[in-house]
Amino acid sequence: MTSTPGATPPASSLDPAVAARLKRGADGLVPAIAQQYDTGEVLMLGWMDDEALHRTLTTGRCTYWSRSRQEYWVKGDTSGHVQHVKSVALDCDADTVLVKVDQTGAACHTGDRTCFDADALPLGK
C-alpha cells in the first residue's frame, strides 16, 4: 500500500492525543528505533509517520515508511524476520519512537542480526 507520509490519515488513524504530542520532521516522519525487548540490543532504525505508528500500535507488528520506495512496509512480510511489538514509547522530546520488539531472525536487510553489526567505527585516542 502506498501513500504519502504526513497526508491526512483515515479517521480511524492514530489517537489524536498521541498525534498531538509527536514532533515530526519536515517530511512528516519520526525516527523509530527497534530494540530487542529482553536484551536491550539495538536492532535497527526505521521511519514512521502517524499511520505507520497507528498500524504498529494496533497490529502488534512494526510498520515503517520506506523513504526510498515511498510506501509502508511491515517488517517480516517479505523476509519472515518479524518484529513482534512488546511496547512503544516516545522519548522526552516526543521526536523519536522506541519500539521494543521480539525479533525473529535478522533485523537487517543484509542478513545481520542488527543493522549495527558490520561497521564499528574506530575511537580516537
From Swiss-Prot:
Q: Which residues form a coiled coil?
A: none
List positions binding Mg(2+): 91, 93, 95
> What does the cofactor section's free text say about binding?
Binds 1 Mg(2+) ion per subunit.
Q: Where in the cell is it found?
A: Cytoplasm
List, alphabetically, the Gene3D superfamilies matched: Phosphoribosyl-AMP cyclohydrolase
Q: Which HAMAP family match?
A: HisI (MF_01021)
Q: Which family does it belong to?
A: Belongs to the PRA-CH family.
What functional role does this protein have?
Catalyzes the hydrolysis of the adenine ring of phosphoribosyl-AMP.
What is known about its subunit structure? Homodimer.
Write down what this protein is called: Phosphoribosyl-AMP cyclohydrolase
Which gene specifies this protein's sequence?
A: hisI
